[in-house]
Amino acid sequence: MGVEKIKAAFENGKKAFIPYVMGGDGGLEKLKERIRFLDEAGASIVEIGIPFSDPVADGPTIQRAGKRALDSGVTVKGIFQALIEVRKEVQIPFVLMTYLNPVLAFGKEQFIENCIEAGVDGIIVPDLPYEEQDIIAPLLRTANIALIPLVTVTSPIERIEKITSESEGFVYAVTVAGVTGVRQNFKEEIHSYLEKVKSHTHLPVVAGFGISTKEHVEEMITICDGVVVGSKVIELLENEKREEICELIQATKQKEEA
C-alpha cells in the first residue's frame, strides 16, 4: 500500500493513465462502479475528488460534478465508506484530490485514519502551499501515504527542486495557467517546461489540466511519465461514452510499447 504502490505504476518504463472521478457525483454506488470500470479498463491510478463548495483550481466541468455531489448530500465519510467497500475488489492505487478545508473540517488525524482504512495511496491538496505542508505531511509520512506535489509553468527551478526533493509518489505538473478543463492545444513552451521538471526531480512526472484527446495524451506521454485526465473523463462518464475512455487508456499503452 501507499508510496510503493504508486511507484509500481511507473516501473519499467510504464506510462500512467490517471483518470479523475468526482466522489459522489451520481451517488456512492456510481463511484464504486466507476472505479471498478476504470480498473478493468486498464487505468494505472484513479484520482478521486472530494467535493468542496469553493473549488478554486477546478474548471466548470469539475465544479459542476462537485456541486452535483454536494447537492445530493454526499459526505466525506460516505466517500470513505464507498472506498473501503470497493477497495476489497480492486488493486488500483487510489489518490485523493482534496482541498485543505475538508481535511481540517473532518479532523486531519481522523481523515488520515480513514485514508488508511480505505487503502488510499496518495493525496493531492491543490491549495496547500509547500511552506505550510507540515500541517499534514508528517502524519501522511507516518501512514506511508504520498503527499503529491503540484508544480506550475511559473514555478522557478529552485522551487521545483525544493518541492520535489521532499515529496513522494509523482510530481503533478500543471500544464496550463488557470483552472482545469478541456483545451484544444498546448503551447510549445509546455514541452520545455515538462522537460525542465523531468530533469530536476527523481520522481515520475505526470502532466495534468486540460488534457482531453488521444493526441494530447500521445503528445504528453512522449515527454513525461503519465497524464491525468479529469474534465474529459467526467464528461465521457456522464454521457456513457466509456469506449472513448478506453481509447485514451490505449493511447497511453501504445506509446509505452513504442
Curated annotation (Swiss-Prot):
SUPFAM superfamilies: Ribulose-phoshate binding barrel
Transmembrane segments: none
Keywords: Amino-acid biosynthesis, Aromatic amino acid biosynthesis, Lyase, Tryptophan biosynthesis
GO cellular component: cytosol
InterPro entries hit by this protein: Aldolase_TIM, RibuloseP-bd_barrel, Trp_synthase_alpha_AS, Trp_synthase_suA
Keyword Metal-binding: no
Keyword Amino-acid biosynthesis set for record: yes
GO function term, MF aspect, one: tryptophan synthase activity
Function (record text): The alpha subunit is responsible for the aldol cleavage of indoleglycerol phosphate to indole and glyceraldehyde 3-phosphate.
HAMAP family: Trp_synth_alpha
Family annotation (NCBIfam families): trpA (TIGR00262)
UniProt similarity note: Belongs to the TrpA family.
Assembly behavior: Tetramer of two alpha and two beta chains.
Protein name in the entry: Tryptophan synthase alpha chain
Protein source organism: Bacillus cereus (strain ATCC 10987 / NRS 248)
